[in-house]
């Protein structure tokens, strides 16, 4: 079962990403190390597989 967008947002915030807003259902996150990510979708929607992969990849980049 796919995870929800709100779970991905929570995971990004725990990893140190800050939400800088966005238009509509888009959210722009940035880490202090300069890693950026745009996540789209309403919090209650299911996350697409590519979104889950992208979040994992960006969190790994921020930990290096």
List each model region and its residues.
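Minor-groove-contacting beta-hairpin "wing" of winged helix-turn-helix DNA-binding domains
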Residues: 26-30
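Basic nucleic-acid-binding interfaces
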Residues: 1-21, 31-64
């Amino acid at each position: 079962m796919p995870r929800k967008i709100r779970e991905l947002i929570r995971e990004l915030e725990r990893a140190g990403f800050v939400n800088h807003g966005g238009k509509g259902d888009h959210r722009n996150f940035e880490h202090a190390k300069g890693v950026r990510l745009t996540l789209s979708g309403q919090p209650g929607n299911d996350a697409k597989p590519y979104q889950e992969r992208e979040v994992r990849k960006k969190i790994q980049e921020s930990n290096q």
